[in-house]
């Protein structure tokens, strides 16, 4: 039996803002956001680009990562992404 993976992901929007989310399929979820069928936030800020994702073994951990990211300042979000290997030129 294959274990299900859960993901916390970060998109960078057309206005250079970040959007953090949770999903079980990162590629499909990013496409949904770009189709205007995702969150209201990204619908108004398309196109979006997948910037970062992290895999978790359980849903709770992925949701906690999403919550923590969403409640940080822009500067802390940038520092988080840089600490996880994303170059600042990508945002």
UniProtKB/Swiss-Prot annotation:
Positions of disulphide bridges: none
UniProt-listed SUPFAM superfamilies: GIY-YIG endonuclease
Pfam families: GIY-YIG
Family matches, as PROSITE patterns: GIY_YIG (PS50164)
Matches recorded under InterPro entries: GIY-YIG_endonuc (IPR000305), GIY-YIG_endonuc_sf (IPR035901), UPF0213_domain (IPR050190)
UniProt family annotation: Belongs to the UPF0213 family.
Protein name per the record: UPF0213 protein LCA_1266
């Amino acid at each position: 039996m294959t274990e299900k993976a859960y993901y916390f992901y970060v998109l960078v929007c057309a206005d250079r803002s970040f959007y953090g989310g949770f999903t079980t399929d990162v590629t499909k979820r990013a496409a949904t956001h770009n189709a205007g069928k995702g969150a209201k936030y990204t619908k108004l800020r398309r196109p979006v680009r997948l910037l970062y994702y992290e895999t978790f073994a359980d849903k709770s951990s992925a949701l906690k990562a999403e919550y923590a990211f969403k409640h940080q300042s822009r500067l802390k979000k940038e520092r988080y992404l840089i600490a996880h290997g994303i170059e600042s030129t990508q945002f």
